[in-house]
């Protein structure tokens, strides 16, 4: 609709002989942080994404041109009068968020019947910005199918075609979203209050004070998707607006009186939320927090606070640790070649035909993952690993690094995954083909006990080949395989009296097909993916935001087969030729010969 229709509008409005078409070929959103801008952008795709300024409705437009003009004007949030000039009812308000589209997929059907007309526009639908400002992608192949009804008989129409019926959401392409919205990050708290949980939000450029808008949102209900995971805010909900003033690199947040009633723990939690939200959103590098002009006390005795002040809440600030890998003999080792387990697993005994006992083959590991640890944490490291048995079944081991024990046996287990609370997750496959997602708490002194995890209907009958839990324990990334290939999904962890459920599933990077051991949480906000693109056999590494909005590509060796990532650590891959390579700057460096399946603590 932003091609022929836009050209016609510009001719009518400006009597111009030439205008630029904008029927661009968009892809899965990969843009960076949003900055204020006009309705124009540099085009790196041969002129396909050039934006044309929106114009007020004029006389003589066809129904198709009216709809095209309205959709273009919808992106000018700073001047809604332009979009409303195409409407029979200028009081219309969008109340259901934004459908983000790929403009290359549009098709238009329209019909006229007297003084009434309909225009149906079908676009490739890549995602939705919800009313709480959060974004989620749509499955590959989704369409946004919208019908607009137009009339010439409404009083406001004055005999011209104007839209009388339309959906209560905006339809914008990615470039329009980036020009119309700021992007910021809100930080909430995990169910136990130990860790910060981030979420990206889109704020209209009409919100002139972005810092205040971000802080106000922290005092409103938690976005629905995260709320179902038990995520909460320590800032009490209030109708009294905080004020934020920024001077140099310091943001001063003055909170209303209810915040003075927070207890000591809540003050620390609220301070961490405010500091991370404002600093990570680029508002300031230091934060000062007051209530009615008086400092809000905190346990750090900090007047101005930085990310370092509250790093204990950050699940990405981990004790330095290297990756583990599995050598050619099936022994798990540290990156320097030292054995991971001390002592190693004992050799099982087998009975000869004479009845005498003899050593059996030691179990061969196929994966081993150390639990992540926060800076300053004490106690022995925990580890979980999977061995392949002589009968081709597998056994899951877990426990402290010096005393792992067998926990479960089945046909197979996915590579284990840990959160920072000592919960280890895996997917168990039994000989009949049935599968169960399992989670168990591992401590240095108790035998792990696992419970079954439910999953909502979206993937209830799908084959899950990989599960990776976020270090804050609130989200999981799943690789699901079907007859058409593999797909990455993200879900939230819901805990209740009825048990643990994975819900709220949505696809991430739907155009790529990840490897089973090719997904890792690179940080609390991003996933690293080893995958092939649709229609290609070339393996590539992708760094994708957990909401699917941003993505960057990293070339990898042609025979890469597994991947691991961790905050502030270089990307590492295992290859089919049984080498482990790490990304050193822009080049891949072989660091292990005769090993594979590297895993950072995660």
From Swiss-Prot:
Subcellular location(s) per record: Cell membrane
Keywords from the UniProt entry: Cell membrane, Lipoprotein, Membrane, Palmitate, Signal
Membrane topology listed for this record: Lipid-anchor
Low complexity: bias regions: 348-359
Record's GO cellular component terms: plasma membrane
Taxonomic source organism: Acidothermus cellulolyticus (strain ATCC 43068 / DSM 8971 / 11B)
Name recorded for this polypeptide: Lipoprotein LpqB
Region (Disordered): 338-362
């Amino acid at each position: 609709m932003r091609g022929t229709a836009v050209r016609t509008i510009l001719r009518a409005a400006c009597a111009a002989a030439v205008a630029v078409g904008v029927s661009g070929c968009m892809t899965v959103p990969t843009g960076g942080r949003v900055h204020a801008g006009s309705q124009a952008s540099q085009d790196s795709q041969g002129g396909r994404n050039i934006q044309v300024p929106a114009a007020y409705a004029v006389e003589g437009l066809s129904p198709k041109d009216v709809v095209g003009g309205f959709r273009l004007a919808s992106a000018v949030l700073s001047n809604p009068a332009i979009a409303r000039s195409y409407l029979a009812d200028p009081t219309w308000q969008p109340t259901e968020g934004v459908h983000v589209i790929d403009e290359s997929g549009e098709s238009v059907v329209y019909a006229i019947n007297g003084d009434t007309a309909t225009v149906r526009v079908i676009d490739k639908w890549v995602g939705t910005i919800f009313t709480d400002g959060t974004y989620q992608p749509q499955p590959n192949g989704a369409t946004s199918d919208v019908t607009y009804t137009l009339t010439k008989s409404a009083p406001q129409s004055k005999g011209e075609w104007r839209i009388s019926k339309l959906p209560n959401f905006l339809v914008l392409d990615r470039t329009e979203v980036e020009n119309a919205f700021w992007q910021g990050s809100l930080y909430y708290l995990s169910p136990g209050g130990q860790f910060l949980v981030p979420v990206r939000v889109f704020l209209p450029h009409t919100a002139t004070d972005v810092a205040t808008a971000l802080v106000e949102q922290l005092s409103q209900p938690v976005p629905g998707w995260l709320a179902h995971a038990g995520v909460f805010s320590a800032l009490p909900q209030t109708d009294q607006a905080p004020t934020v003033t920024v001077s140099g690199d310091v943001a001063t947040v003055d909170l209303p009186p209810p915040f003075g009633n927070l207890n000591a723990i809540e003050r620390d939690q609220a301070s961490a939320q405010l500091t991370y939200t404002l600093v990570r959103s680029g508002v300031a590098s230091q934060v000062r927090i007051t209530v009615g002009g008086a400092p809000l006390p905190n346990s750090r005795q900090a007047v101005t606070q930085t990310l370092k002040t509250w790093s204990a809440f950050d699940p990405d600030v981990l004790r330095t640790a290297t990756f583990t890998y599995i050598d050619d003999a099936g022994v798990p080792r540290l990156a320097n070649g030292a054995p991971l387990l001390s002592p190693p697993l004992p050799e099982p005994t087998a009975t000869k035909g004479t009845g005498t006992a003899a050593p059996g083959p030691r179990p061969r590991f196929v994966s081993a993952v150390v639990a992540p640890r926060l800076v300053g944490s004490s106690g022995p490291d925990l580890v979980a690993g999977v061995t392949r048995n002589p009968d081709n079944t597998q056994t899951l081991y877990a426990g402290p690094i010096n005393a792992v024990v067998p926990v479960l046996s089945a046909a197979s287990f996915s590579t284990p995954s840990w959160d920072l609370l000592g919960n280890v997750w895996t997917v168990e496959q039994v000989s009949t083909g049935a599968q169960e997602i399992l989670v168990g708490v591992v401590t240095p002194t108790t035998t792990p006990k696992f419970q079954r995890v439910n999953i909502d209907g979206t993937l209830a009958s799908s084959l899950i080949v990989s599960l990776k839990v976020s270090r804050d324990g609130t989200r999981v990334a799943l690789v699901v395989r079907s007859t058409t290939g593999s797909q990455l999904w993200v879900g939230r962890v819901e805990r209740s009296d009825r048990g643990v459920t994975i819900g709220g599933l949505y696809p991430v990077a739907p155009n790529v097909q990840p490897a089973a051991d090719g997904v890792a949480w690179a940080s609390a906000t991003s996933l690293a993916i080893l995958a092939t693109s649709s229609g290609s056999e070339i393996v590539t590494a992708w760094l994708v935001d957990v909401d699917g909005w941003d993505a960057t590509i990293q070339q990898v060796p042609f025979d890469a087969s597994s991947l691991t990532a961790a905050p502030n650590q270089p990307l590492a891959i295992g290859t089919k030729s049984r080498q482990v390579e790490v990304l050193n700057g822009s080049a891949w460096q072989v660091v292990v010969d005769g090993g594979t399946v590297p895993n950072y603590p995660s």
